[in-house]
Amino acid sequence: MSKMIRQKTDRSDCEVIANFCLQNDLRYWEPKSQTSKELHEINCRLDSLKMELNRLNNQLEKSYLNEKVKKSINEEMDFIKNQIKTLEIEAQQIVVQNKKLQRNFEIITSIQGVGSKLALAILADADFERFQNGRQYAAFVGVTPSHFQSGTSVKRKSQISRIGSSNLRKILYMNALVVKNRNVDFADFVERLQEKGKAPKVIIVAIMRKLMNIIYGMLKNNQKFDKSLAFGC
């Protein structure tokens, strides 16, 4: 919270900082490990490559392109696909060589419908140890509701916050679709949302949020998926 300060001295600055620390539950900042940095860098590069691949694919769909241009685009896309495959293998090797990452990878993928791509993206960009609860974890990924209201007349429809890694969120979305259609452990959860009249897309976002909450709890407790713990039944 900001304060009205009439003077600025080293002493007053120290008092403000000290009061802030006393009034807030702060955690020590810890730098990422070298392994985490490497995974993060690979994931960022993968994100860029996939965006470029999508751009080229959109360009390829234009009907007026001549054959030489199409050939050039296809060759570039093949090159990018090989780069993506190489980096994904490199990321997997980093995980296999680190016992903690390997264990966390196994924990995340113990949920039916959650694949290796999502697990790698989470390990690279969403370190659970930085957060105090599952809601914070889900908020970091950008799948918690965002509300906007000004006065009594301006009120927008709630939507997800979309902060965090867009690539992670895209992979999470695809995994949520698989979980909805194939994971029987989520059937009751989905059915309750449907009975409330929730739209299909809202249900998918709810599954995304639920997955991040469950994954946080699993990683925090070093435990693979257990339906009774995940859904409290």
How should these model regions be labeled?
Residues S2, E30-H40, K62, R156-Q159, ...:
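Short, solvent-exposed helix-loop connector elements
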Residues N24-Y28, D127-F131, V178-D185, N213-K227:
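Short helix-capping/linker segments at secondary-structure and domain boundaries
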Residues N104-A126, Y137:
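Helix-hairpin-helix
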